[in-house]
């Protein structure tokens, strides 16, 4: 069950259940704008792990982009990536635990529409990013993700056999993103395509039942952990499902107010190591 609070956010709200699993978004939650993770966050996550609490990364990033951070944080837990469309082991052969891609025919239609409108769209297939050349967004995406894209004049050509776990429309004009969102939901409906923002200029497209929270619940169940025993930390629209779920959902103070209002409470700004403060408050101080 997912609840919607829409109330004034409370800093460090009281919570009665023990925390046995901590789920963290990356960008804007653990990873700062300079792409670094503070020593306080690193040290706190290691202490939480050593206390026997599961720490899991749940990100919109593709697996190869998330894995270096998982390693740096010293985690050996599975990685929830592509907004929850893929869950992979972070050890050994990176075994695929779960996959729920966008249906291939639907992906083709959406990519065809974006290309016909001159709208940038990233397509992810088999952990490889495919994008258009000569595009102002390519270099910026490479910088923030540390991923080298395969550049194709016709991105549609990659959608032959394997369906993408997600696609991302990128545009610095919010009106363009909202127009694309409106078109997709009007044309296909929320029952066929999932649409949410992960950054101010990223519109994420997934299968409709994909979310970080659904992947979190599935992992927690495998470990015998109740949803109420999970703490989730995030900052953007793509985190709302897990912030409003049955666990302790805490929004970063640096995130949009609309996101904060969906959470159980808030924690300080990322530059104040809000995620680390939350873990110390709800896990290490108990």
Indicate where each model-derived feature is located.
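Non-catalytic pre-domain segments flanking phosphatase-related domains
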Residues: 1-24, 46
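Mg2+-dependent phosphoryl-transfer enzymes with acidic/Ser/Thr/Gly-rich catalytic loops
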Residues: 12-13, 17-21, 38, 203-286
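Active-site phosphate-binding/coordination module
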Residues: 36-138
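Hydrophobic packing residues within well-ordered alpha-helices of enzyme cores
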Residues: 41, 66-70, 180, 184, ...
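Residue-level signal for inorganic ion chemistry
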Residues: 48, 59, 83, 167, ...
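Short, structured coil segments at secondary-structure junctions
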Residues: 73-75, 82-83, 191, 245-246, ...
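Conserved acidic, metal-coordinating active-site core of Asp-based
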Residues: 117-120, 124-233, 237, 242
């Amino acid at each position: 069950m997912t609840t919607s609070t829409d109330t004034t956010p409370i800093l460090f709200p009281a919570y009665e259940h023990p925390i046995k699993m901590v789920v963290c978004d990356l960008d804007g939650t653990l990873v700062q704008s300079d792409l670094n993770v503070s020593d306080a966050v690193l040290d706190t996550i290691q202490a939480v792990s050593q206390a026997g609490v599961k720490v899991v990364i749940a990100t919109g990033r593709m697996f190869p982009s998330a894995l270096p951070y998982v390693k740096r944080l010293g985690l050996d837990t599975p990685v929830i990536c592509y907004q929850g469309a893929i869950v992979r082991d972070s050890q050994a052969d990176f075994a695929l635990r779960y996959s729920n891609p966008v249906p291939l025919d639907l992906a083709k239609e959406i990519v065809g529409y974006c290309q016909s409108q001159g709208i940038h769209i990233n397509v992810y297939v088999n952990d490889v990013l495919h994008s258009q050349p000569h595009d102002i967004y390519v270099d910026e995406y490479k910088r923030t993700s540390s991923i080298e894209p395969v550049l194709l004049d016709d991105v549609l050509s990659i959608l032959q056999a394997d369906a993408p776990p997600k696609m991302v429309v990128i545009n610095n004009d919010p009106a363009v993103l909202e127009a694309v969102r409106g078109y997709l939901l009007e044309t296909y409906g929320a029952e066929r395509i999932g649409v949410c923002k992960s950054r101010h200029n990223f519109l994420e497209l997934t299968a409709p039942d994909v979310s970080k929270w659904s992947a979190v619940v599935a992992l927690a169940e495998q470990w015998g952990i109740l949803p109420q025993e999970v703490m989730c930390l995030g900052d953007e629209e793509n985190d709302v499902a897990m912030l409003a779920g049955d666990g302790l959902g805490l929004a970063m103070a640096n995130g949009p107010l609309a996101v904060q209002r969906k959470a159980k409470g808030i924690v300080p700004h990322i530059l104040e190591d809000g995620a680390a403060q939350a873990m110390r408050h709800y896990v290490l101080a108990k």
